[in-house]
Amino acid sequence: MQNAEYAYELPESAIAVHPAMPRSSARLLTWRDGAVTSHHRFKDLPAILHADTQLWVNNTRVIRARLLLMKPTGGRLEVFLLEPHERSMEQALASTQCVVWKCMVKGAKRWTAGEAALQVEDSRGKWEVTAKRVGMDEGVRYIELKWTHRSAATGDVQEVSFVELLEAMGKMPLPPYMRRPAEEQDAEDYQTVYAEVPGSVAAPTAGLHLDAQLMANLSASTSIHHITLHVGAGTFKPLVEGDVRNHVMHGENCSVSFDAIQALAEDGVHRVATGTTSLRTLESLYWLAIKWKETGEQPFELNQWEWRNELGTKADRLGWSMETAMQWCANALDRKDWSFRT
C-alpha cells in the first residue's frame, strides 16, 4: 500500500471550519452490501439502522490543551499538551499541585532559560500558571506546570485542579487543517454532545455530527453504548513513509466498562461504531481477548501489528467470534472494567 495511491486534491472550500447547524443536517453517505450507495442526512440514521443495532460512541471529552504563555523576554509561547508524564490522565487532570506534561511548543527556539507565565482574571478570580522546561525527547518537550488561583470574593489562594485551570486559561486544540484561531464557541462546537470523560486533545470527529435531538431519536430505536478512547495529537501525524504499513501509529488510552463488555457478548445484534476511535477500541478488545486467552494474563497494551502477526495465527486456531471473545472476557473480568493502551 503506497502513500501515493491515497493522494488527491482537496480544495480548502470543501474543508468545514465550522459545524453544520443543526449538526444532524450534515450529509451522510451510506454503503450497503453489493456496493450500493445512497445519500442521506445524519438525521436519517434512526430509519437507516436496524432495530436491533448497538450504536457505540466514544464519550471522551476534549480538554483545552493549548496554553498561550509569555516568555521572560516578552515573546509569545504556545504550549500544546500531549499527555501527562508518568501519571494517568485522570491523575494529572485532578492534580492540585504540579504536573509534568509531554508537550509540543511553538516559539521554544529562543526559550533558553526562565519560566514562561500567564495571568488571567475572570468572575472566579485571578489565575496564574508558570511553565518550566525539564527535559526533551525526540522533539517532545517535558514541561513542568504550576498554578495558583485567588478567589474574587476573598482574595485568598484556593486549591483548584489542573482541569479547572485549563477551563479558565486554555484554548481548544482545533485541528491544524482548519487554519483558524480557536473561538469561544468552539468549546461547545468542538465537543460531542455526549462528551463526559476529559482527556482528548482532538475530538472524535464522526461523533460531532450527532446532536441532542438525534441522540434522543436514536435512543428510541437502538441501544447506545459508551466506550472511552482519549484521542492524541498523533491523529494529525502526516504519512511520510512510501509504504503506509511503515507508518508508526501513536498509542492511545482506552477504557471499557464491564457492562459494555457484556453488551458486546450478546449474540444476534448489529453493531455500528461511531468513527474510527470507537472502532479502534472495539477491534482492540477482540485482539486483547485473544492475547489474554493465550498468555493466561490480562493484557493492558496492544501493539500496532500484533493482530497481524502472532495473534492472528492464534485467533485462527481459536475460531472465536467477537461475541465468544467477550463472553470469555466477561467471565474472566469478574465484573471489573478494563483500561488499556492500543
Language model regions located:
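Surface-exposed, charge/polar-rich loops and edge strands
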Residues: 1-342
